[in-house]
From Swiss-Prot:
The gene is rplN. This is Large ribosomal subunit protein uL14. PROSITE patterns: RIBOSOMAL_L14 (PS00049). The lineage of its organism: Bacteria, Thermotogati, Thermotogota, Thermotogae, Thermotogales. It comes from Thermosipho melanesiensis (strain DSM 12029 / CIP 104789 / BI429). One of its GO terms (cellular component) is cytosolic large ribosomal subunit. One of its GO terms (molecular function) is large ribosomal subunit rRNA binding. Belongs to the universal ribosomal protein uL14 family.
Amino acid sequence: MIINESYLNVADNSGAKLLRVIRVMGGSRRKWGTVGDIVVCSVRDAVPNGDLKKGDVVKAVIVRTKKEIRRPDGSYIRFDDNAAVVLDKYNEPKGTRVFGPVAKELREKGFMKIVSLAPEVF
């Protein structure tokens, strides 16, 4: 569960390394987000000479969470870190590569480009 002020690792090569959540999108009283939810974030750490710099406000989609996700078949999945992929204004990934595994719930939410770029889908 990702709430406001949560930190997220960046799972792509957009230039950001660490994000802090400003807002979980989708409703005025939305408390938390999970895999596949879009969040507004501030860049807290970035690579030198990258497209993004510290302080930039970006949209991102959550791709991994430490809190387990319950699937319709009754199974659960959880990851070792909280991670997100930075999005552009068309909700497409800003980077050209995705690092680490992603949850298959992204396919159901319509983020096919991220699923196709990911090395593993769980």
